[in-house]
Amino acid sequence: LLLFSSFEVNSSNDLEAAAINIGDKAPDIVLESPDGKVMKLSDLKGQMVLIDFWASWCGPCRRENPNVVRAYNKYSKAKFKNAKGFEIFSVSLDGSKNAWKAAIEADGLVWKYHVSDLKKWNSAAAALYEVRSIPASFLVNAEGIIVAKNLRGNQLDLELDKHIKSL
């Protein structure tokens, strides 16, 4: 039992060491939108970007979506100190395009950047960012560096407020 516990500690430490961390360069995500258009995270360089991993079938994600919508509406026109603006890059872990599109519509996710490979937990983007639970988010600055992770509710506002000149 002691060996097993010891193995578990080492295993989780190894996973933590390999994880995407604050201060790391955000890996590029290149996936298709619901209408089949290829969208790249790197196209948003120069802006503050919230990478938001979610799915239509995820209750906690759907409950968090109103906070994300509110933040988008509040900050999408804000003046930032070192960025051209604020954008959301939503990555869905859905398997059904219809369910994904319906959730975007139902939850009022009005921003342009919605992507998925419709592979659920086998999503290339989820693997790249080592996402093991959703909702998960990464705030990326204008230089493409991750400045915060897993911001929910007013935590997103508090972090974005550090980077704005005026609303």
Ranges and model annotations:
Residues R63-S90, K162:
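Conserved helix-turn-beta segment immediately C-terminal to the redox Cys motif
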